[in-house]
Amino acid sequence: MANIKSAKKRAVQSEKRRKHNASRRSMVRTFIKKVYAAIAAGDKDTAQKAFNEMQPIVDRQSSKGLIHKNKAARHKSNLVAQINAMQ
C-alpha cells in the first residue's frame, strides 16, 4: 500500500475508474450479445433493431478509449455482414 498521500489518492481514483470502466465494458458486451442472440434466433428485424441500439454505444465507448477503435469496427463489420446474410 502507498505511503505518500498523493499515491493513496491515485490508488483510490484508479479503483473507482476501474469499477466504472468494468461496468461500461460489461454494458457494451451485453449489447453485442443481444445482436448475436437475435442473429442466432434467425430474427432479422430484431437483429437489426438490436444492432441499431448497439452501434452508437460501441462507437461512443471506442471514442473514449474503453475499447479499441479497430475492435469496435470489427464487431460492427461482422454483425452487419451476418445480418445482411440473413433471409
Curated annotation (Swiss-Prot):
What does the UniProt keyword field contain?
Ribonucleoprotein, Ribosomal protein, RNA-binding, rRNA-binding
Q: Which residues does the annotated region (Disordered) include?
A: 1-26
A GO BP entry: translation
Looking up NCBIfam families in the UniProt record yields: S20 (TIGR00029)
Name under which the protein is recorded:
Small ribosomal subunit protein bS20
Which Gene3D superfamilies does this one have? Answer: Ribosomal protein S20 (1.20.58.110)
Keyword Ribosomal protein recorded: yes
Q: Does the keyword NADP apply?
A: no
* Originating gene: rpsT
One of the record's GO molecular function terms: small ribosomal subunit rRNA binding
Tell me which family the UniProt entry assigns to this protein.
Answer: Belongs to the bacterial ribosomal protein bS20 family.
Q: What does this protein do?
A: Binds directly to 16S ribosomal RNA.
Q: Name one Pfam family in it.
A: Ribosomal_S20p
Lineage: superkingdom? Bacteria
Record GO cellular component, one term: cytosol
